[in-house]
Regions:
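Conserved N-terminal alpha-helix of the aminotransferase class I/II PLP-enzyme fold
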Residues: 32-81, 86, 102-109
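N-terminal glycine-rich, Lys/His-bearing helix-loop that initiates the first secondary-structure elements
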Residues: 1-44
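Conserved PLP-enzyme active-site core in the AAT-like
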Residues: 9-11, 70-269, 274-275, 279-285
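Compositionally biased, intrinsically disordered low-complexity regions enriched in proline and serine
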Residues: 29, 34, 45-47, 142, ...
């Protein structure tokens, strides 16, 4: 049975695996785990490689994005840094020209030093993206909407373009969140999140996520994740989705909804799929 996004935000993966029957997932602070006996495992060995609380958050994010697996990182930049480890010297990426500064800094310094090149183009124009593809292009990286100029790309069309040339499509879904946009259902291979923003409310925690549907890609990323160690802290994991739960309260307080294609912006059909903003009532009834 598929649950609504609101239910997933509140209930998580709904897997009640706590041995003491806790309804809310406990925050497991331990670094290591005791096993029942020689050759017997609880499924957890060391918290860098796996933690019950972190696993619950990862499953919840995967469900929200309609992916199969997710990995929770200490920050959004840690997630992107780990993702770049799937590429090799000589590989080429195409990316949105209006992009978060931290991502650009990573590419212009560390990725460049490692022999990976990135060309930033106007990804709101599919033909411009197509013209930038080279034989060594391994991925197209979109922010849609972009940070900070809110440019929108056609995820489905660019996914088809990337796959036709043997590459993958990566989509940073931070600005819309899985509530409004699910790139994996439109053909993306990897979804990136800075969970610090809308998933958690931008006030309490730092986090990042990678979400995928392909098992081989997940295994590759999970190996990088366990090896490099930029995993999510246990206590911080416990605060994940407080912003999403707050959203359920705020939603009842909306006075007016704005749809970008109705307010003088480019009325191309692709705008209808992505952008929404709202006015909040002056007084919120509890």
């Amino acid at each position: 049975m598929a649950f609504a996004a609101e239910t997933i935000c509140v209930q998580g993966s709904n897997e009640r695996r706590d041995p003491f029957g806790a309804i809310s997932m406990p925050i497991y602070q331990n670094a290591a785990y005791a096993h029942p006996g020689l050759g017997q495992s609880t499924g957890y060995d060391y918290s860098r490689c796996g933690n019950p609380t972190r696993d619950e958050v990862q499953k919840t994010v995967a469900l929200l994005e309609q992916g199969t697996e997710a990995l929770a990182f200490s920050t959004g930049m840690a997630a992107i840094t780990a993702l770049m480890e799937i590429f090799f010297p000589g590989d080429h990426l195409i990316a949105t020209d209006d992009l978060y500064g931290g991502t650009l800094r990573l590419w212009n310094t560390i990725s460049h030093k490692n022999g990976i090149s990135v060309d930033c183009v106007d990804t709101s124009n599919v033909e411009t993206v197509k013209a930038a593809i080279r034989p060594e292009t391994k991925a197209i990286y979109l922010e849609t909407p972009s940070n900070p100029m809110m440019k929108v790309a056609d995820i489905q069309a660019i996914a088809e373009l990337a796959h036709a040339h043997g590459g993958i499509l990566i989509v940073d879904n931070t600005f819309l969140s899985p509530y409004f946009q699910k790139p994996l259902t439109l053909g993306a291979d990897v979804v990136v999140h800075s969970g610090t923003k809308y998933l958690e409310g931008h006030n309490d925690t730092l986090s990042g996520f990678l979400v995928v549907k392909d098992d081989a890609l997940y295994q590759q990323l999970n190996n990088i994740y366990k090896t490099t160690g930029a995993c999510r802290l246990r206590l911080i994991v416990g605060y994940c989705f407080e912003g999403s739960r707050l959203w359920l309260y705020v939603w009842s307080s909306i006075r007016k909804m704005l749809w970008r294609s109705h307010t003088g912006w480019n009325r191309d059909r692709k705008w209808r799929k992505y952008i929404i903003s709202v006015w909040i009532r002056d007084r919120i009834r509890r």
